[in-house]
Amino acid sequence: MRILLSNDDGVHAPGIQTLAKALREFADVQVVAPDRNRSGASNSLTLESSLRTFTFENGDIAVQMGTPTDCVYLGVNALMRPRPDIVVSGINAGPNLGDDVIYSGTVAAAMEGRHLGFPALAVSLDGHKHYDTAAAVTCSILRALCKEPLRTGRILNINVPDLPLDQIKGIRVTRCGTRHPADQVIPQQDPRGNTLYWIGPPGGKCDAGPGTDFAAVDEGYVSITPLHVDLTAHSAQYVVSDWLNSVGVGTQW
């Protein structure tokens, strides 16, 4: 199995390094990751400037100022030859649950892999300690995929409780929960008296009941949520169409 491995925490982050070491025991792994933390970069691409890369002695490649999506795009289309069999993103430091998937560079890297035609996993740890647990879970899933491919055409968003492996209760297939809107902005002043702003933490849990990714992780289970990129609200198409007809928009300007 050939694996393109990326993340949004940066090429030196403990999550990606722990996972790369574990994966290399049974797979051919090419790390292509940002040279710095790009958390929250979502699916952004660098279009207004060129991208430079740096290759370390162990073969890992850092993309200077690159986004997670840049890294996967370059990895698939230029840097990994032969091309990978699968794209894996992670292990993220902290969860990507519910609405987090909209902003997550970890999930975005997996989405880019899927967009380019490859199976893809996004892996996150609900904390900053037991990366070895998340690596073991990921390796188990990838070994299973080697034996029997999962042809859903979907991204698997995997969130792992920050627990020792022997305390993980199992795996649940879940849906994305939701968070309350984030509303905190943290102002500071620079030495010249100018105001600076920091984006605050994400909103608290809103829909976090049974069946959600939040609930699974809180209860000690690995959460696997299949994701797709069709953002069309199909059930709303008729509502919008009826509304346009009723108000006359499009029949006269």
From Swiss-Prot:
Protein residues bound to a divalent metal cation: D8, D9, S39, N92
Cofactor note: Binds 1 divalent metal cation per subunit.
Gene Ontology terms for molecular function: 3'-nucleotidase activity; 5'-nucleotidase activity; exopolyphosphatase activity; metal ion binding; nucleotide binding
Protein name in UniProt: 5'/3'-nucleotidase SurE
Family in the record: Belongs to the SurE nucleotidase family.
Gene3D superfamilies: Survival protein SurE-like phosphatase/nucleotidase
Localization per record: Cytoplasm
Reaction equations catalysed: a ribonucleoside 5'-phosphate + H2O = a ribonucleoside + phosphate; a ribonucleoside 3'-phosphate + H2O = a ribonucleoside + phosphate; [phosphate](n) + H2O = [phosphate](n-1) + phosphate + H(+)
NCBIfam families with a match to the protein in the record: PRK00346.1-1, PRK00346.1-3, PRK00346.1-4, surE
SUPFAM superfamilies referenced in this protein's UniProt entry, alphabetically: SurE-like
Keyword Hydrolase on entry: yes
Pfam families in alphabetical order: SurE
InterPro entries associated with the record: SurE, SurE-like_Pase/nucleotidase, SurE-like_sf
Required cofactor(s): a divalent metal cation
Function noted in UniProt: Nucleotidase with a broad substrate specificity as it can dephosphorylate various ribo- and deoxyribonucleoside 5'-monophosphates and ribonucleoside 3'-monophosphates with highest affinity to 3'-AMP. Also hydrolyzes polyphosphate (exopolyphosphatase activity) with the preference for short-chain-length substrates (P20-25). Might be involved in the regulation of dNTP and NTP pools, and in the turnover of 3'-mononucleotides produced by numerous intracellular RNases (T1, T2, and F) during the degradation of various RNAs.
Keywords, in A-Z order: Cytoplasm, Hydrolase, Metal-binding, Nucleotide-binding
Cellular component GO terms held in the UniProt record: cytoplasm
Signal peptide range in chain numbering: none
